[in-house]
Amino acid sequence: MKLKSLLLRYYPPGIMLEYEKSGQLKTKSIDLLDLDPSTDVSALVEEIQKAEPLITASRSDQVKLLIQRLQNKLGQHSNHKFYLFKVLRAHILPLTNVALNKSGSCFITGSYDRTCKLWDTASGEELHTLEGHRNVVYAIAFNNPYGDKIATGSFDKTCKLWSVETGKCYHTFRGHTAEIVCLSFNPQSTLVATGSMDTTAKLWDIQSGEEVFTLTGHSAEIISLSFNTSGNRIITGSFDHTVTVWEADTGRKVYTLIGHCAEISSAVFNWDCSLILTGSMDKTCKLWDAVNGKCVATLTGHDDEILDSCFDYTGKLIATASADGTARIFSAATRECVTKLEGHEGEISKISFNPQGNRLLTGSSDKTARIWDAQTGQCLQVLEGHTDEIFSCAFNYKGDIIITGSKDNTCRIWR
């Protein structure tokens, strides 16, 4: 094995190694999730050298410099104030979803008008209209971090793969017998997973366009689906009240998480893949050990359904959004509620941390999105202007652009 280059990854903090093994270029990452501005860099470099044979003594100064750059970045706490940059009347019929590419340079919108549109964030101009579906385009995604492909899942029971550059369709994936309502690329961008009202999920090969596996076992629609960070596991959440974890390379069921007593609304791994977080219409979130599938905690306190939940990149904080109009932040270590986010006047359907992990973004049926301090729970900003419910909101990779999508058929860019 021969080390070719070292690359920085800012969020979450880490160093990517590009190395050659038997003539092939491979990558692996050293995750530095606990890095903070006070970390002893020399001691950390020694630790890394002991654990990683590719990092030889001759590379230690370079690694030290990279870690110092990461530390500087972590020290820059963003107090960015967002302003409305553009309003896009994206589609004639209602929007279903919005998604950003990694850099935030472009984003996509799905709609009841059976199309997906690709937009330039800086100018607000439409770059492509992706046409071909015969029903609502509901689930959409970029193959981040690459960002050169788009997947669209439709009520017409198919998923299509598109080129970002040309807007041309590469493949149409057929096989589901009911609407596709969720989809995800694996981190390597070799597979697309689709979840459907037909109770199954399917994995598709991006190169060949062929179906690789069908994941069967749920008894109701699959509404949430995601890969873990390394891409070797996939998680599906269903209206049958359960969540199942599958092996991505064999399609084998690893285990089913049973314990919620109502429909699942979200299911995600934390960054290091040690924990799984599930949110449910039963008003609770549960934390599960990702190794054995055992429930390690139930997070309570909300008075109504949990509509969304997520980890920050360190996996130390958990955020939950509820139909009771509040969001909460829990500590993953103590499982206690750290702070409550109060201020919305309607249900909160979306919640996410910014990439730095110090801000939270919420979208609500009260027609506003809000930005909160993740430590104190203080509301820092209210993004107003939509005339109907906000169902989708997202940060870009740097955390300095926000997109909101609303039932008023517009998208707003904030920067």
From Swiss-Prot:
Quote the subcellular location field of this record. Answer: Cytoplasm, Cytoskeleton, Flagellum basal body; Cytoplasm, Cytoskeleton, Flagellum axoneme
Q: Which CDD domains match?
A: WD40
- Keywords of this protein's UniProt record, alphabetized? Cell projection, Cilium, Cytoplasm, Cytoskeleton, Flagellum, Repeat, WD repeat
Give this protein's Gene Ontology molecular function annotations: ubiquitin-like ligase-substrate adaptor activity
Matching PROSITE patterns: WD_REPEATS_1, WD_REPEATS_2, WD_REPEATS_REGION
Q: Which Gene3D superfamilies match?
A: YVTN repeat-like/Quinoprotein amine dehydrogenase (2.130.10.10)
**Under what name is this protein listed?**
Dynein assembly factor with WD repeat domains 1
- Pfam family of the protein (one): WD40
Main role? Required for axonemal dynein assembly and ciliary motility in ciliated organs, including Kupffer's vesicle, during embryogenesis. Facilitates the onset of robust cilia motility during development.
Subunit: Interacts with IFT46.
- Write down the SMART domains for this protein, in alphabetical order: WD40
Which chain positions lie within coiled-coil regions? none
Which GO terms of the cellular component aspect does the record hold? ciliary basal body; cilium; cytoplasm; motile cilium; SCF ubiquitin ligase complex
Per the record, the similarity remark reads: Belongs to the WD repeat WDR69 family.
Give residue ranges of the WD repeats.
90-129, 132-174, 175-214, 217-256, 259-298, 301-340, 343-384, 386-415
Q: Which GO terms describe its biological process?
A: intraciliary transport; outer dynein arm assembly; protein polyubiquitination
